[in-house]
Amino acid sequence: MAIKMRLQRFGVHKRPFYRVVASDSRVTRDGKFLDIVGTYDTILNIIKLDNEKVQKWLSCGAQPTQTVKKILKKNFVFQKDNQIKKPQTAK
């Protein structure tokens, strides 16, 4: 079973709201999922992610889609081996 981290659409017409979920790659976009990793509000541009869950699923071999990878890059720093490292805080 190949696991993907992808966006699951919610909201109403012209007001999308997404959940970042870990799901089987063979399941439809809005189908069953294994775990909710975070949320993404496109209107207000608010991204909320559970850091522990993100690292857990990436260490299990989950492959983020291109859009989720961009969201993760906004909040984290990718290393070469696709592991996530928290950014350093300013001193």
Curated annotation (Swiss-Prot):
Which superkingdom? Bacteria
For this UniProt record, the keywords arranged alphabetically read as follows: Ribonucleoprotein, Ribosomal protein
Question: SUPFAM superfamilies, alphabetically?
Answer: Ribosomal protein S16
What Pfam families does UniProt report for this protein, alphabetically? Ribosomal_S16
Membrane spanning residue stretches: none
Q: Which family does it belong to?
A: Belongs to the bacterial ribosomal protein bS16 family.
Specify the protein name. Small ribosomal subunit protein bS16
Which species? Answer: Phytoplasma australiense
